[in-house]
Amino acid sequence: MTVSPPRAAPAVPSVSDTAYAAWAPDLQLLLGGEAAGPLRALIETASGELLSFCPRQVNHQPAQPGGGSSTIVQYGAQVRWAGGRVASETLVMATGGRIPRRAAVVDGDGVRVGIWRWPFDPDLPGLASAVDADTVSALLATLGMGGGKVRLTVRAYRPGRRAVIEASGTHGRVFLKVVRPHRVQALHAQHRLLARHMAVPHSYGYSTDGILVLQALHGGSLRGALSGPAVPLPGASALQGLLDQLPAELAQNQMSGDHLSRANHYADVVAGCLPDERVRLDELLGRYAFSEAGEHPTVAVHGDFYEGQILVERGRVSGLLDVDTAGSGHRIERVGDDARPPIRPRPAAPEGNRDLRTSAGLLLRLNSYRVVAGVLVAASRR
C-alpha cells in the first residue's frame, strides 16, 4: 500500500525545506509524511484503508509562556472501505490545547495527537445529526417549519469550533450553524436581538446538542463581489452605516477580542509557519509601536468585520453574518481586516467602486497601526 506523501517532507508544496526544518515539532508532524501513521491507524480502526491524504486547512498557535504550541489540521483523504468502495473523507488531527477532551489520542513520533473523522467531531456533538437528512427534517418539524425531504450542503467547517450546513426543502432554505452545545442558547439570543435591529439572520430555534437554525438572507458575499466580474457595490458610507445599526445593548456585553493588542501574537503565528518573514514582520511591528491609537469610546462592535461577513445585492448591503463575537469594543480596532489584500481594484471596475476596493480604510480613515494589525490578522488566517 502506498500512502502519500511518502516521506518526512513538507506536505505543503509552497513551503521551503528550510522553513519546514524551523517549524515546531507538532507542525512538522501534522504537515509532514509522518502524519500518515496516525491517519492510517484511525481509518484502520473503522475497517478502511488510507490511500492518500493532503492537508486542506491549518490553524497553528505558537508556544506561549508555560505551554507548548498547538495545531489543528484538516485533511482531505481518499479511503477504500470494506467492499472496495473508494470515498473522499475529511480527517482531523490536533495537538496541544486543541485536543478535545473526548477525542481519540495517539502518540505520533513523541507528539500527543487527538484525531477524528468527519462528522464525528468531539467538540461538536450535533454535527453528525446536522448532516443527516432525516434528523434535520425532524428538527425542522419540531420548530414548526414543516418536515419533508431536505437536501444538505456543507458550507463551512472549522474543526472543534463550528460548521455551517445549508438545508433546502419544502420549508425553503435555512442554514444550520453547529457550535459547541454550551454556546448555542446565547448565540440564539444574540441572533434574535440583532435581527430586530438590522439584516442579521433570524434564529428559528436550536437543539441542545448545538444546532442553531438560521434564516437564509438574500445576496452574496462582498468578498465574492470584489473578486468576481464587476458589479455595483455599496459605498464605504453604507458599511459605516451597517456598523451604526448594531444595537447599543451590545456595548454592555463582554469586550470583544482586541486584534491590536495581539499584534505580536499574530506576528509569532506567521513567523512560526514562515520563519523567513520574521525580519519583515518585526519591521511592521516596529512601525505599529510608534503609532498612536488615541482615545476612542467603547461601543457596539461586530468583532470580526470583514468582506466575507457582509452580504450585498444590487449594489446594496443585504446582510451581516457571523455575529458570534459581537459585543463591546473600540470600533477603530475592528476594521483592520478591511485593509487586507483581497480589497484591490479590478481593471474593469466602475470608477465609483474603486475607492472601496483600493482603500477600504476610508471607512474609518485607517492609519498605519490599523493596517499593520489587518495585515497580521489576515496572514494568521491563511
What is each PLM-predicted segment?
Residues 176, 303, 321:
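Active-site flanking residues adjacent to catalytic metal/cofactor-binding acidic residues
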Residues 2-192, 197-199, 203-204, 208-210, ...:
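Phosphate/pyrophosphate-binding loops and the adjoining catalytic core of nucleotide-dependent enzymes
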Residues 298-300, 313-351:
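Active-site Asp-x-Gly
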Residues 308-312:
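Hydrophobic residue at the +6 position relative to the catalytic HRD Asp in the kinase catalytic loop
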Residues 39-43, 134-155, 191, 249-303, ...:
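An alpha-helical support segment within catalytic cores of ATP-dependent transferases
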Residues 334-359, 368-382:
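Active-site activation/catalytic loop segments of kinase-like enzymes and analogous catalytic loops
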